[in-house]
A protein has these predicted regions:
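Conserved "HGTGT" condensation-loop signature of ketosynthase/thiolase-family condensing enzymes
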Residues: 2-96, 110-115, 122-179
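Conserved phosphate-binding catalytic cores of ATP/NTP-utilizing and phosphoryl-transfer enzymes
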Residues: 103-111
Length: 179
């Protein structure tokens, strides 16, 4: 999770990462595990603590990476803003969870700060695949043989990367190395 801050004058519109936070949630009982929203809230609180100042309620922008482990919670962007007590002017969730999505959201936030559209942004993403798998295994019935937590019934149009055969991280990372 990253927090960014920019300022009003052109010389101060240089985006800077001012706080980072990460959480690895591995409780013995999967029923005690955090869902993606809980993970993002905790990670952003850690990012705020990393800055040494109170910022989360002042966010101008929240961008969330789409998640697959708790699909019924989507979209999470407005829920995250509410959980943080923030009312950002820019609040959205990516259309799909891809390996390059966090860096794309980071780039978009930096561009908005540089353009003077926003001053403070948060980028967040979380998966709770271990938690959902553990819960399903713990509460499984003989008829449950499908991992419902990651089933995505939504039909999506392929994005630019997919139209060009860039479907897996191994396809995309060489582009970064050669950029």
């Amino acid at each position: 999770m990253h927090l960014f801050k920019g300022a009003m004058t052109d010389s101060e519109r240089i985006p800077v990462i001012i706080g980072v936070g990460q959480i690895n949630d591995r409780p013995e009982d999967p029923d005690n595990g955090l869902d993606p929203l809980g993970l993002m809230v905790e990670a952003l609180k850690r990012a705020e603590a990393d800055t040494g100042v109170t910022l989360l309620k002042k966010l101008d922008s929240i961008a969330v990476v789409d998640q697959i482990s708790f699909r019924h919670l989507n979209p999470l962007d407005a829920k995250l803003a509410e959980a943080l007590g923030a009312t950002p002017a820019v609040c959205y969730q990516s259309d799909a969870p891809h390996g390059d999505t966090p860096i794309r959201l980071l780039n978009e936030a930096a561009n908005r700060i540089g353009a003077g559209e926003i001053k403070l942004a948060a980028i967040a993403g979380a998966e709770a695949l271990r938690t959902i798998a553990g819960r399903l295994a713990k509460h499984a019935t003989p008829q449950q043989d499908v991992f419902e937590g990651v089933r995505n019934e939504a039909k999506r149009e392929p994005g630019y990367a997919q139209q060009h055969g860039l479907n897996a991280p191994v396809d995309v990372y060489p582009l970064y190395e050669n950029a």
